[in-house]
């Protein structure tokens, strides 16, 4: 029996549908009615009602007594936090991220690559006017972000080729690279230089400098970036900033096992 058939045999429909509801509730709307959830998940309202009843009993969702809409509970936050806490790299990174953020008074972010996207696992907010809607656990494209490009650059060649075949390069700004050959050339350059630069490729007006973080086996396991408003980029000594970012990721990276 092949892996594909095994995967379909063990897919439990009720669990799959419950996760669809949780994902719908996790989107930007804080609360949703049963009819809204039905529309977003393509599940009929009676199914949504039954699943919500189970999720309420498990303390994963609750109903607002005033609006009668449903929302997620802190139970999901507890579960998510426990996953992040298992990443030893986050605990190692926090003091160094805080120091880098204080040095430049800019936002500093830490991310991992997961299923063709980057996932934010920690961030230090900027006290300046730059406020990006980057929630912990949120997913973003890898190919047009500084964090993502540095992670893609260190993939094995067959993994990168497979990624480029799967992914569709969507244009977010005039600077987004949407040619796969051009992107591959840039990723080769990133690996050679040891850092990546996102020049308003994902969000207009925002640039990012990023470098890789390594685990105990000296494999790239995460990436760290400074997000800077483009208007302030010229005020910084970019080569020095790059050196400081790389120095920070070297401090965070675990020492190779002997």
Annotate the PLM regions.
Residues 11-15, 34, 69, 73, ...:
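Short, structured helix-loop boundary elements
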Residues 59, 120-122, 222:
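A structural microfeature
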Residues 130-202:
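Short, solvent-exposed recognition segments
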Residues 162, 168, 249-258:
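Cysteine/selenocysteine-centered motifs that mediate thiol-based redox chemistry or coordinate metal-sulfur cofactors
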Residues 1-86, 90-91, 98, 254-255:
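N-terminal helix-turn-helix
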């Amino acid at each position: 029996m092949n892996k594909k058939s095994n995967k379909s045999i063990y897919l439990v429909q009720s669990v799959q549908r419950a996760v669809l509801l949780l994902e719908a509730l996790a989107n930007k709307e804080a609360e949703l009615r049963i009819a809204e959830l039905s529309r977003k998940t393509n599940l009929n309202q009676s199914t949504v009602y039954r699943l919500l009843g189970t999720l309420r009993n498990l303390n994963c969702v609750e109903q607002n007594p005033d609006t009668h809409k449903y929302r997620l509970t802190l139970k999901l936050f507890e579960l998510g936090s426990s996953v992040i806490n298992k990443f030893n790299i986050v605990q190692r990174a926090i003091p160094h991220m805080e120091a880098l953020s204080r040095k430049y008074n800019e936002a500093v972010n830490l991310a991992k690559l997961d299923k063709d996207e980057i996932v934010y696992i920690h961030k230090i907010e900027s006290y300046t006017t730059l406020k990006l809607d980057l929630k912990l656990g949120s997913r973003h494209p890898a190919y047009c972000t500084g964090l993502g490009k540095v992670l893609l650059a260190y993939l094995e060649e067959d993994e990168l080729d497979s990624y480029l075949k799967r992914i569709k390069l969507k244009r977010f700004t005039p600077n987004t690279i949407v040619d796969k050959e051009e992107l591959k050339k840039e990723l080769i350059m990133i690996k050679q230089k040891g850092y990546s630069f996102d020049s308003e490729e994902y969000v207009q007006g925002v640039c990012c400098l990023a470098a890789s973080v390594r685990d105990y086996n000296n494999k790239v396991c995460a990436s760290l970036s400074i997000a800077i408003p483009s208007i302030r980029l010229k005020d910084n000594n970019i080569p020095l900033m790059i050196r400081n970012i790389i120095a920070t990721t070297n401090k965070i990276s675990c020492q190779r096992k002997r």
